[in-house]
């Protein structure tokens, strides 16, 4: 994110929506250390040493936000602004930055509540008020592919709406281990594709500790867990995981907004102007 003025304007509007309109609480997250902060994709993590102990550079503030909400269930919601480090082996110019700002949120409710909140955010930012949605399997059948990629994301915004909600992801897309399983291998995950790029990634969270534990160890045929074990040791990873499982779970959802992509989308829609 190179333009500080565009960054400031976009973040200011998102902060106003979540804090002033929705009553969410902004929380500090970046100062915390966590192995599960590498939860987006362990194959792209980078590490650092602090006080003689290795940690992953954070890819997301999700696990910290979840903890804040679960520890403080009376708040309407929480959000944070973090820096995401993704050591992508083959970054696509215009789509992937290895280091970029993230605006993340967590709140009470199910997938429908999540879609409603995200729709209200888009309307608040100026993208209009009419958005279409399509289930993942329906879209993959339409375009004749098993998994949707960049070309399909661009097609979605041409065929449906500038802001398209891609919903209900199947198991073959390797959903994160604590996403809510709706049954029959379908997970309550929603990506919001804006101007041809996934800009908001979100999901209803799981509440079944047994199912989450099984999913953590078995997702991607165990490769996900083994990558973390190899980097940080099985005991450290499982100790942190079990500490999370001790929290009292309730219905909730959360998401992350790539600020660079949101700025690009808002510029394309004429909602942000260069200064």
Per-segment meaning from a language model:
Residues 43-108, 134-275:
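A translation/RNA-centric and nucleic-acid-associated enzymatic feature enriched
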Residues 125-133:
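Flexible helix-coil linker/hinge segments at domain or subdomain boundaries
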């Amino acid at each position: 994110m190179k333009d500080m003025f565009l960054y400031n304007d976009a973040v200011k509007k998102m902060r106003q929506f979540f804090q002033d309109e929705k009553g969410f609480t902004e929380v500090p997250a970046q100062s915390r250390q966590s192995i599960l902060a590498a939860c987006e994709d362990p194959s792209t993590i980078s590490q650092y040493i602090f006080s003689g102990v290795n940690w992953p550079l954070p890819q997301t503030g999700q696990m910290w936000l979840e903890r804040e909400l679960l520890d403080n269930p009376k708040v309407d919601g929480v959000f944070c602004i973090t820096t995401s480090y993704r050591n992508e082996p083959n970054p696509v110019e215009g789509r992937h930055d290895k280091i970029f700002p993230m605006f993340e949120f967590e709140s009470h409710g199910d997938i429908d509540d999540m879609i409603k909140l995200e729709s209200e955010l888009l309307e608040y930012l100026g993208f209009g008020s009419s958005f279409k949605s399509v289930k993942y399997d329906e879209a993959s059948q339409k375009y004749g592919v098993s998994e949707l990629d960049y070309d399909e994301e661009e097609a979605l915004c041409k065929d449906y709406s500038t802001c398209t909600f891609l919903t209900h992801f199947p198991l073959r897309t390797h959903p994160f281990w604590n996403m809510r399983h709706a049954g029959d291998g379908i997970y309550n995950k929603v990506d919001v594709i804006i101007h041809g790029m996934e800009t908001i990634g979100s999901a209803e969270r799981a509440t079944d500790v047994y199912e989450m534990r099984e999913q953590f160890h078995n997702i991607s045929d165990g490769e996900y867990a083994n990558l973390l074990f190899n980097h940080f040791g099985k005991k450290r990873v499982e100790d942190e995981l079990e500490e999370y499982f001790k929290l009292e779970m309730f219905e909730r959802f959360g998401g992350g907004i790539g600020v660079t992509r949101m700025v690009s989308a808002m510029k394309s829609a004429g909602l942000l102007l260069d200064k």
